Swiss-Prot record:
The chain crosses the membrane at residues 51-71, 73-93. Residues 1-19 form the signal peptide. It comes from the Bacteria. Keywords: Cell membrane, Membrane, Signal, Transmembrane, Transmembrane helix. One of its GO terms (cellular component) is plasma membrane. It comes from Mycobacterium tuberculosis (strain CDC 1551 / Oshkosh). This is Uncharacterized protein MT2276. It is a multi-pass membrane protein.
Amino acid sequence: MAKPRNAAESKAAKAQANAARKAAARQRRAQLWQAFTLQRKEDKRLLPYMIGAFLLIVGASVGVGVWAGGFTMFTMIPLGVLLGALVAFVIFGRRAQRTVYRKAEGQTGAAAWALDNLRGKWRVTPGVAATGNLDAVHRVIGRPGVIFVGEGSAARVKPLLAQEKKRTARLVGDVPIYDIIVGNGDGEVPLAKLERHLTRLPANITVKQMDTVESRLAALGSRAGAGVMPKGPLPTTAKMRSVQRTVRRK
């Protein structure tokens, strides 16, 4: 009797897993459509660019197929449709991301939000230091080493960065320490270019060393005032943030 029961349980588990996957797929499609609708309202050039790119690639593929003739013509058409759809989706994703960053620019907690959305093996600790004016320093551990990212008034953030670098250097030894101020002033990194700036830093330590550094710095905790920092941009960009999350999943 055990075997039939196990077989029935296994079948039920598979059916439940399939139902969960289908439900998740439906939810992703609904989120993607919502993201597209929101972006289309924000960006009047989105549809012309997407349609233009799709038609251009399909037309080029058809032209190549007709020129080559034979079986190639029948393979180039579906290939062109797939490639055109892919390029159109890439255009949508890039423009949606640009809109999200534009709306978040200058808002309190925007840098922390951007760091939280980093792709890759980054270890982010938001608000390791802050002031009562909502200036903040966030700590990132990655292959480059330790990176401190400040947001707010540069005059108030620079002393915070110096303090964090000093007390961190005592624990990490020769691991490189970088500091960045997010903003549009001289020597600052715009919010939209923060991820690109981080990924262009040299890889100085291994993933194993990252674990060691993270363990050492965990004991530091956060300085006074860090708790007043919000964990993301102000609520006005909540809907547009879902655009970026959905596009990233796809």
